[in-house]
């Protein structure tokens, strides 16, 4: 199939998805848990793909994604709170320093740029480390930035340890899908470009990549900065979804969740990260919720079912996946337009072959 036909089929698939989501919003009540899964899943898909760009395609083991999401969330919130609401939000800091509000699209881009700037400054010394040392350094950065943003000395900007609120949010599931979809498409274009091939060469063998003329540090920091940019955008989307921002929400556990999503989906697979994001959110927010509720059947209380047991079961499931199916759902494969068309045509091809054989007899 040529590129033109692939593009046409891709556009048709995207249009069909958005029509389906539009009809879904008109059919189901706004409180349906399905919308929670779709909204949060779309946001986590973006941050998982951004982490996969580092871990899966460049071979850099980073654990700082929650820190960059925090920067993006705060940047978006700070620059979009309406001036008339700032006295309520910054009530302990005389209305704060910033007294203007940016449009939502501009603030989303600014959130990514702020995270990218921090990534560049942190990456200059940190990316000279490798393996576990890099992971520890980036995890340390995420924890430090979380503490700094809660510092009361920065209260006129960050509101200290208090909530940021009253900034623009979204209610439609179409918004996070549109923003995340656009960002993921840009990441895919990057992966398929000459820069993406350089990232993969670094992942496979740094010595061989350097021998081929690839500037290792330049491409590593480029991958780190771009990944952080999209993590910042996803942080802004998460702030819009949650309607409030507080630094204490961006703990190391958030990075571990994102890393698990990447591992479950398949390290080096964009579509794997997207699929596992929705599965992860569906399990943690919806399907396994009953495990947290105490259940009594005919006077007998079912053992273990109490608050927190859901996370235990979910952890066991993840351990089984990591131990017995290490490649994840997709491995390093992708769901392509060609593959989907072949999958759809397969039953019809078998039926036609059976009819042809019967006619020949």
Residue spans for each PLM region:
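Transmembrane alpha-helices and adjacent helix-loop boundaries
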Residues: 1-361
